[in-house]
Design a protein with these regions (language model features):
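Active-site hotspot residues in diverse enzymes, especially metal/ion-binding acidic/histidine motifs
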Residues: 1-169
Length: 169
């Protein structure tokens, strides 16, 4: 599935097929007004569900949110650690141990930590960073926007020049 995310062609349909083959129900909902929810997951009657929202139409956000929810399914729900598996917005804590684990799972699934350790160490300006990391992503067969999304997530720098290839394919 990670390869399909990096290829970013017919991405939503491909992801749905891959998840269905694993017994995971998947759907995409339009953006939820006044809610900053990119996705959620739960298990009902033994069936895992992943729902993503169209909060952003960007492959980096889609890929991270998807793998974050896959992380919840495999790390927290299927191992029996959680049985309720319901999202409660008032109780939601982005800094909880489970959220941190799902974030780490997603980051490592999309760009393995061993690979990430060898990424360019450029921190000059957004244009230089974008150029160097795009070149590195191309050399590694990774989607440049997923790579730049990780840079944004880790550094808080979001000033990269966007183009049509950032949209979900």
């Amino acid at each position: 599935m990670v390869r399909a995310l990096h290829d970013n062609r017919s991405t939503e349909n491909t992801v749905k097929e891959i998840l269905a083959a694993e017994g995971i129900a998947f759907c995409i909902e339009e953006k939820v007004d006044k809610a900053s929810v990119d996705g959620y997951s739960y298990i009902e009657d033994g069936i895992p569900y992943i729902i993503l929202t169209r909060r952003y139409d960007r492959i980096d956000n889609f890929a991270f949110a998807l793998m974050h929810e896959v992380g919840h399914i495999y790390l927290h729900y299927l191992d029996g650690r959680r049985s309720d598996c319901k999202l409660s917005i008032p109780d939601y804590d982005n800094e909880s141990a489970e959220e941190k684990e799902a974030n780490a799972f997603a980051a490592n699934a999309l760009i393995p930590n061993e690979e990430w350790k060898n990424a360019p160490k450029v921190r000059l300006n957004p244009a230089m960073i974008q150029r160097k990391y795009t070149q590195w992503a191309n050399e590694k067969g990774l989607n440049k926007w997923i790579v730049l999304g990780r840079i944004s997530y880790e550094t808080g720098m979001y000033k990269f020049r966007s183009d049509e290839s950032r949209r979900i394919g």
